[in-house]
Amino acid sequence: MQKNWQINNKAKVILGAAYKNENYQSLYAGSSSTTKDYSRDNWGVYSQWEQAFNEKNTAIVSMRETWTTKADGDNNYNNFSAAGQFVHKLDDENNIYASVGQSFIMPTFAQMYGASDSAIPNPGLKPQTGINYEIGWKKITGKHSWKAAIFHTDIKDNITATWNSTNSEYQYKNEDFKNTGIELSCDINTDGPMSYNYGVTYQNPQSKSDTKGYWDRKFGRVQLTGGVTYKKNKLTSSLSGSYLAARVATPSSAESYDTKPYFLTTFNTIYSPDKKSDITLTIDNVLDRSDNVSHSSSSYYSTPINFLLSYTYKF
């Protein structure tokens, strides 16, 4: 439920509320003689105020209150988060901005209670909270849209899966996470049906768990992305790729070590014969590469080239 108001020609307000009921049932199986039923009600109220001070300066402030009720064992959460952004227009083509925002993510029931031959439940999993900072520049000139940004992220109790290679099992746990980096991207439109995009990010993601007690490298430092899209009449097709280099594998109880880059590619095409129908073909791993996409001490290789053909009808 959401309501938008145009207060005047310089101010806009958004107010909204959200509700969702979650339920998780662990049914009887050969490995378990009991059944379990978990549920909780998720509530949220939020607001946003956008204020244009003049032709060059605009500020946006948003707030959200999130809470749960009726959780098992009274394991309820309550969080207030806020965000703000200031945009300054340099000229008709250039803007600079600065933003800061808090984040809040609750653990899912699957992460807390999910159990299988390889998954270990963690009912004590805590929600993750964080704060994100970003300053940047945007430029729209002709058919090009440029963006450059410097960012920093701090997350407390980041929810992450940890793999135990000895027992061949994994469990979701909390660890602290931080990342600082710079990114540059460009979107290119043309007079014809083609459009293009590319981007590069240099970053330094790190994590600290109770097991290690020190900041250790994670994921990869260099990411290159790119894509091309063809759109004409009822057909839209796109080819995209993501290359992650300067990667590390990060074991749960040992120091990270270097691992090879990976290159992921996807082709997607949608044909819409009418307003209610879509025929979609998605092909993953177009180059049929065998890349280890895991960032833990175990190896998990990308699925060979595969496709999904689907039909969607909107009522």
Which residues make up each language-model segment?
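Outer-envelope beta-barrel architecture signal
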Residues: 9-13, 55-59, 80, 92-96, ...
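Membrane-embedded beta-strand positions of outer-membrane beta-barrel proteins
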Residues: 15-17, 61-63, 84, 98-100, ...
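Transmembrane beta-strands of outer-membrane beta-barrel pores
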Residues: 19-25, 65-69, 88, 100-106, ...
